[in-house]
């Protein structure tokens, strides 16, 4: 399913917050877009990555926290840009309030929806890089590819297959074995 523009005029934060709870949407430059519901494979990947990252962060006993969607990230006020990454890691607690992360998370993972891959590969890549996200992964279940963008070192579009062990660059020792996740998708 492609993302649909919900209204033509630009929206305010108040209008966005007034949307019904069951509406999944993101705002880019003041324009609100509908989000498709995730697939089963999307949710399997999300759950596995979330648990792996959470367990690593707990062992580190650091200040970083991991959040799954739906949790808003307000990248800018004017024009309003609010996204809901599939997974994000935030290491600056001052960016967090009860409603959202205000500013760029340190690490974002998006799992590609079949109907609108350009949203993750182009639009969000642009917004995340410009907002100051340190690292951004695009996980594509259909193509079985993970694209790593390590903005902090200007390393872009490094692709790995689902049989790879991939290092999370912002951490010294966090490795994700995608072959284990791929096995779960085949059962």
Model-derived segments and spans:
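Gly/Pro/Ser/Thr-rich low-complexity, intrinsically disordered segments predominantly at protein N-termini
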Residues: 1-187
């Amino acid at each position: 399913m492609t993302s649909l523009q919900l209204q033509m005029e630009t929206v305010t934060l108040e209008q966005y917050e007034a949307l019904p709870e069951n509406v999944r949407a993101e705002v880019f430059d003041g324009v609100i877009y509908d989000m498709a519901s995730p697939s089963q494979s999307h949710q399997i990947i999300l759950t596995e990555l979330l648990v792996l990252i959470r367990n690593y962060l707990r062992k580190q006993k650091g200040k970083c926290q991991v959040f799954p969607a739906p949790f808003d990230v307000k990248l800018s006020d004017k024009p309003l840009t609010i996204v809901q990454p599939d997974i994000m890691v935030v290491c600056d607690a001052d960016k967090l309030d009860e409603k959202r992360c205000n500013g760029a998370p340190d690490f974002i993972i998006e799992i590609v929806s079949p109907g609108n891959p350009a949203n993750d590969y182009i639009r969000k890549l642009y917004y995340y890089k410009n907002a100051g996200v340190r690292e951004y992964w695009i996980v594509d279940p259909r193509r079985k590819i993970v694209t790593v963008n390590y903005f902090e070192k200007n390393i872009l579009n490094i692709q790995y297959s689902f049989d790879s062990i991939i290092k999370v660059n912002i951490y010294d020792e966090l490795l994700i074995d995608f072959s284990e996740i791929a096995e779960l998708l085949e059962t």
